[in-house]
């Protein structure tokens, strides 16, 4: 099973986030995934509706049931306000290169 995030390099994270990466735990629907959508399917993204808030904070362990106050009212765990098609293009290239390399290595 391949997941795109397994192939995102630290250099790509640094270039996209400029040292402000909130972490993978709160990235779902954040800058990276929204940037990919802006690059691949911009007509499906309504950036004017993106909330701008601090990333959600969770304890470093699983807790059930999850406390509703841990999730921002928007339902988004981090803001996608800094997303761009350019970031999406960078991310797609890094992931395609990484996945292609691994598949070529595995099936060579």
Give, region by region, the residue ranges found by the protein language model:
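Extended, histidine- and acidic-residue-enriched regions that form the cofactor-binding/catalytic faces
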Residues: 1-108
């Amino acid at each position: 099973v391949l997941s795109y995030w397994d192939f995102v390099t630290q250099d790509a994270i640094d270039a996209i986030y400029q040292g402000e990466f909130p972490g993978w735990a709160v990235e779902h629907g954040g800058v990276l995934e929204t940037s990919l959508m802006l690059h691949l399917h911009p007509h499906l993204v309504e950036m004017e509706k993106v909330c701008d808030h601090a990333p959600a904070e969770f304890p470093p362990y699983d807790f059930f049931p999850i406390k509703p106050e841990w999730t921002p009212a928007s339902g988004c765990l981090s803001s996608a306000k800094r997303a761009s098609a350019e970031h999406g293009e960078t991310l797609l290239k890094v992931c395609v290169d990484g996945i292609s390399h691994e598949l070529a290595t595995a099936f060579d």
